Amino acid sequence: RDFRNLALTELAHTVCELLDWRRPQGGLKSRECYQFLQSLQQRGWLPWLPTAKPHARRPHQTVVSAESDPQLPCTGDLRQWLPVEVQQITERRERQLFQQYLHRYHYLGYRVPYGAQLRYFIRGGRAPARILGCLLFTSAAWKMAPRDGYIGWDESARSGGLTHIVNNSRFLILPWVHIPNLASHVLSLGAKAVERDWPVHYGAEAVLLETLVDRSHYAGTCYRAANWVALGRTTGRGK
């Protein structure tokens, strides 16, 4: 009640400061705290604040351009397309094209990622290398029973260890690309890229990768070929 005059944003900052809830690089986890407090507010569990009415967020609008139109087929043996590289995306124009590709060609579409994230283009062939697909890595799911059982940690250990787990939330080989064994090769390259880049951007070593495979669409064959381990089924993904 001492903080009843604070706006929700200010309250989130204050809670993070009092609990010393920080990212590995030292910044406060204010966004995560705000989202949590907002969910409590909507349930009426913060009685000193007005009950927030859920409102529909304006969906992210992806502007589609001809740049993401289907291209000439990429076919042949993987050796013909070496070296294949995963190139981190840092420029605005590249981010926009990345969003377009996922929006148009990934069955889940594109959503603005929440929290930590790394984007990569998959490029292959001799110069100029062609874009063959996209990889998106984000912060880990808050709870996932098969994963948590595999690791064997409790609530406290999970809370401290999640910064070392990275989720492969999107993996797209563009529909005009038909190169056998490309997907598993890319997953191996992606794992090395995350191991290199995650500590640079977020100050935490990436020690485990996770993903969810929709069995109604895919069998997860490329993940198994890249030495990923199937842990079981889950009912959903939550932060």
Each predicted region: which residue ranges?
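Charged low-complexity interaction tracts in eukaryotic proteins
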Residues: 22, 28-67
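Acyl-donor binding region in acyl/amide transferases
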Residues: 6, 17-39, 85-239
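Low-complexity, charged, repeat-rich alpha-helical/coil interaction segments
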Residues: 9, 40-47, 78-85
